[in-house]
Amino acid sequence: MARVKPLGKKLRMAKAIKQNRRVPPWVVAKTGGRVIDNPKRRHWRRSKLKP
């Protein structure tokens, strides 16, 4: 990938990095185990971001 990226693409990638986290333990505790997994989790090799 190019080292110099357009600003829009860079911002989208930064947002994707922030979204790609597990559910915090305090959320699991607060919801009583109803919320365990994050449906928006993305693996870098299995599914790619839109360009």
Swiss-Prot record:
GO molecular-function term, one example from the UniProt record: structural constituent of ribosome
Domain of life where this protein originates: Archaea
One Gene Ontology cellular component annotation held by this UniProt entry: ribonucleoprotein complex
Keywords (A to Z) from UniProt: Ribonucleoprotein, Ribosomal protein
Signal peptide: none
GO terms (BP aspect): translation
InterPro entries to which the protein is assigned, alphabetical: Ribosomal_eL39, Ribosomal_eL39_CS, Ribosomal_eL39_dom_sf
A Pfam family that the UniProt record links to this protein: Ribosomal_L39
Keyword Repeat tagged: no
Similarity comment text for this entry: Belongs to the eukaryotic ribosomal protein eL39 family.
Name of the protein this chain belongs to: Large ribosomal subunit protein eL39
Organism in which the protein naturally occurs: Methanopyrus kandleri (strain AV19 / DSM 6324 / JCM 9639 / NBRC 100938)
